[in-house]
């Protein structure tokens, strides 16, 4: 039963990450698994579960604060293309994404579907 609870927790973490960020599910899953593994190890060694939870919450606050301080706004078409190219691992895809975003604007929606056609 504990394994099922853990699996459900990791699924929820991945889903929430995808809903909020649209990316990062693998990283979130690895982090969740590490938190559960190390948390259980510490509790088994005698750590207070509530103290452990509070420590994790403080660490999350500090990490979030640090990430927000170092975050950079992506505003220009060139910045969007560069960011998208890194994410996609392909300069041409980055350019296409930037072009699509330029056309639909900040409030627009871009839908990507798999195709049986070869090429872009």
From Swiss-Prot:
Q: What is this protein called?
A: Chaperonin GroEL
One MF annotation (Gene Ontology) recorded for this entry? ATP binding
Give residues annotated as binding ATP: 23-27
What InterPro entries would the database entry show? Cpn60/GroEL (IPR001844), Cpn60/GroEL/TCP-1 (IPR002423), GROEL-like_equatorial_sf (IPR027413), TCP-1-like_intermed_sf (IPR027410)
- Please give the family membership noted in the entry: Belongs to the chaperonin (HSP60) family.
Q: Which domain of life is it from?
A: Bacteria
Q: How does it assemble?
A: Forms a cylinder of 14 subunits composed of two heptameric rings stacked back-to-back. Interacts with the co-chaperonin GroES.
GO biological process: one example: protein refolding
Give the Enzyme Commission number. 5.6.1.7
| Record bears the keyword Chaperone | yes
- Gene name of the record: groEL
A matching Pfam family: Cpn60_TCP1
Cysteine pairs bridged by disulfides in the record: none
Any one Gene Ontology cellular component term annotated for this protein: cytoplasm
Q: Which reaction does it catalyse?
A: ATP + H2O + a folded polypeptide = ADP + phosphate + an unfolded polypeptide
Q: Where in the cell is it found?
A: Cytoplasm
Question: What keywords sit in the KW lines?
Answer: ATP-binding, Chaperone, Cytoplasm, Isomerase, Nucleotide-binding, Stress response
Report the top EC class in one word: isomerase
In UniProt terms, what function does this protein have?
Together with its co-chaperonin GroES, plays an essential role in assisting protein folding. The GroEL-GroES system forms a nano-cage that allows encapsulation of the non-native substrate proteins and provides a physical environment optimized to promote and accelerate protein folding.
